[in-house]
A protein has these predicted regions:
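Short, charged/polar surface micro-motifs in flexible loops or helix N-caps
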Residues: 12, 47-49, 57-62
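Residue-level preference for beta-strand/loop junctions
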Residues: 2, 33, 46-48
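Short, surface-exposed ligand-recognition loops at beta-strand->loop->(often short) alpha-helix junctions
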Residues: 9-20
Length: 99
């Protein structure tokens, strides 16, 4: 499994808009049911920092891509305008998981 963690801070006046765009991504994912990855997004307690975690599963032969989801494309299209600073992606190793 390969994981990516993305952290960023949104301009306070755009935080609710950012959350709405994220919710649209999850609605699109629910409709499309892509396979091969797990995706979670978190809005931190301060209301302006967000964390996204994508885990790509090794056991799927024809993995779908989050980047192919139209609502995700809309979400990332102007992320730079909504952010205080550019998002910071980091590769991560899954040490453990519980469902």
């Amino acid at each position: 499994m390969r994981a990516t963690v993305v952290r960023y801070e949104i301009k306070p006046e755009r935080a609710d808009e950012n959350q709405a765009l994220i919710e649209a991504v999850f609605a699109d994912l629910e409709e499309r049911q892509p396979e091969g990855f797990t995706y979670k997004a978190f809005r931190l307690e301060d209301g302006v920092r967000f964390v996204h975690v994508v885990v790509e599963h090794d056991d799927v032969e024809n993995r779908d891509s989050l980047a192919d989801v139209p609502a995700f494309q809309a979400f990332v299209a102007d992320i730079g305008d909504r952010c205080v600073a550019p998002p910071v992606p980091s590769g991560a190793t899954v040490v453990g998981a519980y469902h």
